[in-house]
Design a protein with these regions (language model features):
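Long, low-complexity, polar and repeat-rich extracellular regions
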Residues: 1-77, 101
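Membrane translocator/pore-forming domains, dominated by Gram-negative outer-membrane beta-barrels
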Residues: 1-7, 11, 19, 67-217
Length: 217
């Protein structure tokens, strides 16, 4: 059960970071478009709160006249999988659904900066006795990118904070034990990449540093 809590914390940071980096990459590829607002949330969420958020975002975006200087976007995600039993942990079935909403704008020097908020629900079944872990996570992420050299080398920066809420149900010797736990997170990423074009080919070498810290009460 302890490892499942750690895995959720790590996965939450990874999802929040990857979503922001993917947004920056998408903008660079489509920067010539007049409207860089984007939605990718046409998913059937099992969680009622996520489903309501998704519907509200789509309706409000259609009805709202966008600011020409600010671009709004949203993205939904679903993930599920299994982890086999090891010498130190029981097998686990993992299911995660989440939604991210964000807004960004261009900065002086052809850079980009923005903020994104992500909410997700994680359901983990541990072992075969009926133990399970439910977790809600909330993350606020600042992201930016700026050209370092011409329009070929970029430095991406991610800084974020998060909160976690665990509801734990453990089955031990036939008895069910319930509890809850809270957590706080801080994380950051620096990524530098360069586009090297030669003939009809493009090579994109990149280096990335990730840091994250989670404190569980």
């Amino acid at each position: 059960m302890a490892l499942a809590q750690i895995e959720i914390a790590n996965r939450t940071i990874a999802h929040s970071t990857d979503t922001a980096l993917n947004r920056l990459k998408w903008i660079r590829r489509n920067k010539d478009l007049q409207d860089l607002s984007y939605q990718n949330i046409k998913l059937n969420f099992s969680n009622q709160m996520l489903a309501s958020l998704s519907e509200a975002i789509q309706i409000s975006t259609k009805e709202k006249e966008k600011d020409d200087d600010i671009f709004y976007w949203a993205e939904g995600s679903l993930a599920f999988g299994k982890v086999k039993e090891t010498d130190t942990s029981s097998k686990k079935k993992i299911y995660t659904d989440g939604i991210t909403i964000g807004a960004d704008k261009f900065t002086v020097g052809d850079g980009i900066k923005g903020l994104a908020f992500r909410f997700s629900q994680n359901d983990v079944k541990v072992g075969t006795a009926g133990s399970k872990l439910d977790a809600n996570t909330y993350n606020l992420t600042y992201y930016s990118t700026a050209p370092v050299k011409d329009d070929r080398r970029f430095l991406d920066t991610i800084i974020g904070v998060g909160a976690l809420r665990y509801d734990i149900s453990s089955v031990l010797d036939g008895s069910k034990l319930n509890g809850n736990r809270n957590g706080r997170q801080i994380y950051g990423t620096l990524k530098i990449k360069e586009e090297i074009k030669k003939d009809d080919h493009t090579l994109i070498p990149a280096a990335q540093i990730d840091l994250g810290y989670t404190l569980l009460s």
